[in-house]
Amino acid sequence: MDIILASGSPRRRELLSRAQLEFTIISVDIDETPYQDELPKDYIVRMVAAKAEAAATQLNIQLKNNEAHSSKSLLSQPIILLTSDTIGVLPDGKTVLIKPSNREDAYHMWQQMSDSTHEVWTAVQATQLSLHSKHTDEFDTEPVWQIINQKQIIERTEVTFIALTPEMMSDYWDGGEPADKAGGYGIQGLGAAWVSRINGSYTNVVGLPLAQTLALIKEMTNTAMLENFDA
């Protein structure tokens, strides 16, 4: 069964590659702005579902334009589509930390995480897609990808920061690493110097809880095989 990772994150691509899985990559663009007072679980569940819908729509556009026929992996069926979203969550359990929009936003996040423990949450959704015929008029049909099954998991990891000084924050921002990362830091990069300890999955903090994601893929693959056998 073919796997498509719908993510522009190089960190998620690298992690999934470590499992020696063959997969195709597509990028999706959605509005990731949290709703007012939206709780962390509600936010990341909404994000991975929205990314899956956007990816399915993109695949159908490619199929209609015959672009998909240039890629063998998009011709097999069914497909497992993986979407993921990572956020930081402050000790209040309510405040969502996404990618900082600017220096001031990053400083505000870091000041709240300094010398304390926050959580990193990652939601992963596995969506099973299958080709079906859609009637375009009374006589004609066209193939479309349809969502036939989906499952989500959420992994949480506790991360404790040392006390941060203004100079540390300034130097880190100027280095360019924080801008595209939830919570404004990368534990796999220079941000590791701020982490005194973690409790839970390290790869979850990087952006994809690898062991849990592989278990999810296996579960979805087995389910799809059973469905095909029953059919």
Curated annotation (Swiss-Prot):
Keywords: Cytoplasm, Hydrolase, Nucleotide metabolism. GO terms for biological process: nucleotide metabolic process. It is found in: Cytoplasm. InterPro entries: ITPase-like_fam, Maf-like. The active site is at 85 (proton acceptor). It is an enzyme of class 3 (hydrolase). GO terms for cellular component: cytoplasm. Its cofactor is a divalent metal cation. Its EC number is 3.6.1.9. The keyword Plastid does not apply. The record marks 11, 86, 188 as: Important for substrate specificity. The keyword Glycoprotein does not apply. One of its GO terms (molecular function) is UTP diphosphatase activity. Its main location: cytoplasm. It comes from the Bacteria. SUPFAM superfamilies: ITPase-like. Nucleoside triphosphate pyrophosphatase that hydrolyzes dTTP and UTP. May have a dual role in cell division arrest and in preventing the incorporation of modified nucleotides into cellular nucleic acids. Belongs to the Maf family. YhdE subfamily. This is dTTP/UTP pyrophosphatase. It comes from Psychrobacter arcticus (strain DSM 17307 / VKM B-2377 / 273-4). The lineage of its organism: Bacteria, Pseudomonadati, Pseudomonadota, Gammaproteobacteria, Moraxellales.
